């Protein structure tokens, strides 16, 4: 099923709770789960290269195409929400969002979304279809290094920057310590030349053969819809945080 799974969390939950017959496979097309660049970033996070991950910053912008049936939250943000859940391997505790309405009869043209995870990790998502530049970026900030995923940069999809913030003794009267930047080299790791769509299709075929649910299954699709709905609700409340209580 093409993402998002449904146009509301309730409809997605109904699908997620639908009793599948033995052997039935239900997959939602969250393609970035199968992007070799995103999966390399995830490996860097969990092998300790970045240290402790503090936050993610995601940008998905372009000048169009504009939709009138749904807001930019439901149109563009599913990708970045999916990436965030994949990288952090869990659900946020709360969501807040603000949205701008600039075109005539617009359901929402630009949005700034913040996901707060139980461990304090943050994800900031900027989505827009009224931006002059097409950008598809994810920055992962860790205590030891940071990594950028840039889907528009074919030869440099992932770049690791060995830069850390260090606490050093301070002799200033303005604080007991100060932060300094320790800069190191930048590394461009090898990314296997795999096509995400092909990888997604192969995952589906594998699930059919093994009769096991795929990585982006119906429950995953529901959780993403729950986050999108919470973001839209927060935007209507001028950015008030909305708690997430996914039921599956």
Model-identified regions with their sequence ranges:
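Short glycine/serine/threonine-enriched helix-capping/active-site loop
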Residues: 27-30, 56-59, 97, 125, ...
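A general structural signal for well-ordered alpha-helical segments in protein cores
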Residues: 12, 35-38, 80-84, 197-202, ...
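Short arginine-rich
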Residues: 227-237
């Amino acid at each position: 099923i093409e993402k998002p799974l449904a146009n509301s969390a309730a409809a997605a939950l109904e699908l997620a709770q639908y009793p599948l017959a033995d052997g039935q496979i239900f997959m939602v097309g969250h393609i970035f789960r199968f992007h070799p660049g995103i999966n390399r970033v995830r490996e860097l996070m969990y092998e300790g290269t970045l240290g402790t991950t503090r936050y993610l910053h995601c940008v998905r912008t372009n000048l169009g195409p504009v939709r009138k049936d749904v807001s930019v939250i439901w149109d563009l943000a599913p990708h970045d929400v999916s990436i965030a859940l994949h990288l952090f391997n869990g659900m946020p505790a709360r969501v807040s969002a603000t949205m701008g309405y600039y075109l005539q009869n617009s359901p929402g043209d630009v949005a700034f979304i913040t996901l707060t995870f139980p461990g304090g990790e943050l994800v900031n998502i900027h989505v827009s279809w009224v931006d002059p530049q097409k950008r598809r970026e994810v920055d992962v900030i860790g205590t030891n290094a940071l990594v950028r995923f840039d889907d528009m940069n074919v030869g440099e999809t992932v770049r690791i920057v060995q830069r850390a913030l260090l606490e050093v003794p301070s002799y200033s009267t303005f604080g007991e310590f100060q932060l300094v930047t320790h800069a190191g080299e930048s590394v461009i790791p090898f990314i296997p030349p795999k096509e995400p769509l092909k990888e997604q299709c192969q995952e589906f075929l594998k699930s059919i053969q093994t009769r096991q649910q795929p990585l982006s299954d119906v429950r995953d699709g529901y959780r993403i819809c729950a986050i999108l709905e919470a973001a839209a609700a927060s935007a209507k409340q001028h950015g008030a945080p909305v708690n997430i209580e996914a039921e599956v």
